[in-house]
Amino acid sequence: MKLKVVWLGKTKSAAIKALTEEYLDRLSHYGDIEGAELASEAALLKMAESSKTPPTLVLLDQRGRQLTSEELAEMLEAHQLRGTQSLIFAVGPADGFTQPARHLANLVLSLGKMTLAHELARVVLLEQLYRSFTIIKGHPYHRGE
């Protein structure tokens, strides 16, 4: 399974860039995982619609479904087991995704009830994806219940 984490807009903070690179490096040990900066929502929709095999698209939005770390790990493992070829997690712009993008998504996911800066949400997502893979592999990083 190819896992892609994309975010819309330029990254302004050097600290966010460093954390993004750190977690993408950690995630690279668990499979074909990459990050990408896209200019716009239109670029995301074009990428999703032009793929030979339609990807599973997960949009991050404060109005989305909330999962525990364990539930996210279960979701990722289920995609691996059923042979999902391409899974895209997209962190939107500060104002969120439009209705057409939300309609195209397979899942709209929220990181919680609090509002996060979209650059920070990217880092939280990457950490949660890393945590999920450590849960799947039985690595001691996760110390949940």
Residue ranges and their predicted role:
Residues 23, 75-79, 104:
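Catalytic-core regions built around general acid/base machinery
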Residues 17-20, 69-73, 102, 122:
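Conserved strand-to-helix beginnings and helix N-cap segments that scaffold or border functional pockets
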Residues 11, 62-65, 93-96:
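Short glycine-rich anion-binding loops that position phosphate/pyrophosphate groups of nucleotides
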Residues 5, 58, 92, 125:
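Conserved RecA-like P-loop NTPase ATPase core
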Residues 99-144:
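Structured adenosyl-cofactor binding patch, chiefly the S-adenosyl-L-methionine
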Residues 28-88:
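S-adenosyl-L-methionine/SAH cofactor-binding core of RNA-modifying enzymes
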Residues 86-100:
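Short glycine-rich, acidic/polar surface loops and turns
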Residues 1-23, 27:
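N-terminal beta1-alpha1 ligand-phosphate binding loop
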